Amino acid sequence: MKMKTIIRQVVLGAAVLAVAGCASYRWTSGVPKEMRTVCVPTFRNETDITELGNVTARQILREFQREGTFRVARQDDAAVEVQGVLKSQNTEYVGGDRRTGMRYGVHNLTVKAVVSVIDRRNGKVLVNNREYTAMGSFTTGQDVATHRRDASGRVAEDLATKIVDDVLRMKW
C-alpha cells in the first residue's frame, strides 16, 4: 500500500470517530422553548436549620438565572415548577486540633431533600420525589449552631447545582 493511501484511511477513520463522538452533542438547549420559564416556591423545611427552605429555593432560582436556559417567572406564568422538601440534616464531627490552645472542630453538614418537577401547563409530574443529598464542611469554635447555619448556604448552593443540572438533562 502506498503511504498516501494509508494516510487517507487514517484521516478518514479519525473523522468518522470524531463525528460519531459528537453525534449526541447539541449547540442549543434540549429544553423546548415553551418550557423555558420556571418558578421555585419555598422548599418545605423539615430540618432544624432555620430558613433553609427559603435559602435553598433562592439558590435554585439563582442557579437557573446563572445557567441562562430558563427565565424565572411568577408561579402563574411559569411552565415548570420545582417543588421540594428538605427531609433531614445531619451534622457530623470530623476532627479538630487542640494543640493551638483554642478548641475548634471540623464538621460535615449533610442535607437530604426530595424534589419534584411539575409541568404547570397540564399538571403532569415530570420528576416525582427524586432524592438529593448535599454536603458541606465547616470549622467551629464554641458556637456550632451559627457556623452550621453559615455552612447551610453552601450546602444549598450544592443542592441547587445538582437540581438545575438534572432539570436541564431531563428528557423533554
What are these language model-derived features?
Residues 46-58, 104, 108, 146-158:
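Soluble non-cytosolic domains of exported or imported proteins
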Residues 5, 33, 145-146:
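Short alpha-helical segments used as structural interaction elements across diverse proteins
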Residues 1-22:
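Sec-dependent bacterial lipoprotein signal peptides
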Residues 21-62, 66-77, 121, 131, ...:
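A structural "domain/chain start" motif
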Residues 26, 67-71, 77, 81-126, ...:
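Surface-exposed short loop/turn segments
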Residues 8-9, 41, 49-55, 78-86, ...:
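A generic short-segment signal for beta-strand/edge and adjacent turn/coil regions
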